[in-house]
């Protein structure tokens, strides 16, 4: 069984269709008398005929024709412009066309030259006696513009075949024919058929752009006019040969050989390659040679020759329907129309039929003809004798299709087609407008995941949730049809606006599309805003509009009503009071805002009447609060059990650096773990069927405790257990004892590589966006196997908060300009609204008074809370230490209004800095800066003398409070851990 492919080791990469057909004919030089060119154009322009021909076949880039009448004019044009093809017509008045072609070839050896001539016996004799060494091809003009297209495509195929076959495995159809008149007739038929088939197969592509690109992967046609040329082309492209069409009689060793086609067929068959062969002949008796070669036969004299050729190619080369035959009777068993049809029917194919078609490479040819190269390459090398059980072969074909479809669907914004959207579809759009900010972000994520398949591991898939975006043009239609702008832009309250929107009707064409989406998505659906401004690189609009979650309802019309109401409620949120106020504050106009809607499966699992994921998270590629061995560029992540609303609302999350997942401050001591870890979480209430929508988009979410999660069985693999008897925290889940959300199996024991995946995604995201990024994600563990999980990327956005933009080099700021400066700073940004500094007087400092100092600070902080003002707090030792000999033992509520906290060492009071660890969660949640200063050893600067010279607002035995007339400026560079407090 060693020959059976292992799909786990196989990574399908998307075919780079954009890199195919790179060499094209854009300009054609036509050398002909005015009369000949008139005959060629048939009283119309060649450009127009070619354009019409291209358009009818969905081809792009039709070439432009430039007509000249003499060799001199031709050379002049060639000198001044680039041409990719020269077409000559005989009967030039002043010089023989063949001599002229030879002269042109001397100067321009790389430009193909084609002679196009009306045919007669006289012309045939003349050509037979001419030196054709300068001519690439001679064609017989029969008055059809399809020949011009065939000539252009033949030359383009010749130019591109070496690169395109080598890079992705584009297939070759070889036509062997020496009759000028015959191949001038056959090639247009052949090209038209191949192009029409490719156009039809391209409909399986997901959008117009993909369809156009996929046409580039069509089989190329090569023309051989003698035996030696046929063998050379075959040998060059034998591994990419889709099929061969050969005449029986043509030149061999310089003479006409009536059996040359048969001999060439024998040459092909001796290679052992299974290649369809069609033998053509004007003598019907030659069909016996075709039978000997196991080839099809076509009578060239048949009046139905074009139809016969089309039929044979359809049957033998993999075009058209895949007809599954009974190998014994050759009766049709079933017909397979496309990829999805094959996926559905592959397990219905009888064993003997499967062996018959696999052994003859019919399956690989089915894929090759449709430019589906990755699965074709695998199936081409399958040896059916390796399979003792044909169900394994069926499963291989099925799994190949699934893997291929998933690969094709990832990273592509498909046009939503209700009959094609299924469980393997990933991202589609309804409408022609914008996707909005979230929609664009999701599309970008999908493309990024596709470009980096190594993000995934065997037990940890990386994906985006199944998504459909309702574009902004649907919003426009909804607003205008229902005449909602007057109430939306007026002064109505939020509840009134929502009521009007819920009464309105969505465009009727959405109904069937939504119904089809419900059939595919088996989980609850998130209805998310995706406005034009949201998640913009320069517009921090995240979280301004509503997101509703809708439980899965089995009755489809109830589901339709609920999702429709959610869509309308999201539309209404554009015009709520807070949205309008935010628009004004950010200098945006409300009537310029447009809303797309993201419909997305909610990540998670069902636990009784609740639905939530194993974890939700937010991660940033920059960490402005690095501690220990962490660096700013290592990034930071916050994760929590349940829905992401808990994180957005500022809940207690587990915070770690993806590059240091074993060093988690919250788990560093038992006291921290018990006090600073998550105890509540959000879940979707599946019993709340949203009978009446509320302005509050969280109306059907419930906040639960860890005991609820424990009862529902969702904690087993993500917690540690506190043993109160032994006073220890044990890794893992044990009966009894308090459960602590440590995610220890994932972060410390690497059950699946969350930290490494986050690190890679943040690095790649920053690289792709060209700036630091923030991502939202969710992880859901496989309920049947806790070692497997799926990581879902929900959003990516650049970090654009203005306070986090720091271009100044703070190391250049002189000490005399500052009250404080530090080279050990946590936090980032510029604070410009603080006028007050509270500092512990160092002159008579004694650590035995630290408890009294804490009381005084609490009292002062209370007055700042009442005034809703902030201040800078400076003092010696570790702030928040439970040991009052090491620092002032304040709790967070005692200093909650401090905007910057400073640990200042003294010559006679040297304590290792705490880096704010005692209330680290509060520092990071509220963006508070933390400075460490040790002036006595040249580490930082504190100008206490300057503060002592300022009048005090309040002064106690231990503290002094100074207020400046104007705000002081505080600057923190979290990337370099530098910070200054400037003098006013």
Language-model region placement:
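Short acidic, S/G/P-rich loop/turn micro-motifs used as interaction or catalytic elements
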Residues: 34-39, 71-73, 85-96, 120-122, ...
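Conserved phosphotransfer microenvironments
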Residues: 10, 39-42, 46, 51, ...
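Terminal, compositionally biased segments used for targeting/anchoring and flexible tails
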Residues: 285-412
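Conserved mixed alpha/beta core segments that line enzyme active sites in large multi-domain catalysts
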Residues: 417-456, 505-905, 922-925, 949-983
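As written
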Residues: 97, 127-138, 289-298
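A structural-propensity feature for long, helix-poor, extended segments
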Residues: 466-514, 582, 820, 824-830
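Hydrophobic/aromatic residues positioned on beta-strands within the core alpha/beta folds
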Residues: 116-118, 280, 300
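Non-catalytic signal-transmission and effector/linker regions of two-component phosphorelay proteins
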Residues: 1-66, 130-137, 141-220, 227-228, ...
